[in-house]
Amino acid sequence: MQLQKIEKKIYALSENWVGEKHIPSLIRSLNNAFKRNIVCFSSERFDDEYFDDHNIIVNAHYCARISDFIPEHIYIALHFPSERKRALITKEGAKNLAVRIIRAIHHEYRHKYQQRQRPLLSQKEYKPKPKQNRMKAMYYGNPDELDAHAYETQAEKLNINKLRRAHKISWKESEAVFMYRKTFRKQDPKVWQRFLKKVYKHGRSLSGTTRTCIDSKNQ
């Protein structure tokens, strides 16, 4: 299924998400919508604090076909606050959830493409700098993750002209750009610039716009 069709399907479903929702029913509606696709959904719980419009965490992973019992799939888990039996979703929250799901699917489809391009080959690990958070730097610095996070920004419809001042892009505008700026802009500028170029490349292919220069302020 094309990613554009997936976006339309998710946005159509999100129109019915506002209000107090029965979680199993919400998951079931998503799985029914994607029953002929490799995407599947489940629900989990979390205990951390959250914002009213960002109260559902979305995690995902791609798994290539292992056997007849474990087919190729993209698994998406929606994490709901443990304190509530039902999901309470605001209008803005429904929009945010739709973007997060679409973004996760974009990300995992990119991993699918990566594996098909070079099966069973892993990328070289990123070596964190002395003052970096080791786990975050190794995760975001991995070449496959950098490419997939850049690719997922298409789901946010990020205006690539804003990359001239990427250091001003907020978490709400693009989580990936925000996290790569926070992790690499000062600690390892080469990775930050490499990421921005990937975002620009994917964004330009989506919008068909002409090339613009990334401002030196991002360096």
What are these regions (language model features)?
Residues 3-11:
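Acidic/histidine-rich, surface-exposed loop or edge segments in extracytoplasmic proteins
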Residues 14-38:
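Zn2+-dependent metallopeptidase catalytic core
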Residues 99, 115-145:
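Post-HEXXH active-site segment of zinc metalloproteases
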Residues 8, 134-145, 150-219:
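Long, well-structured alpha-helical subdomains associated
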Residues 52-99, 112-116:
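Active-site scaffold of zinc-dependent metalloenzymes
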Residues 100-108:
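Short alpha-helical catalytic segment bearing the HExxH-like zincin motif
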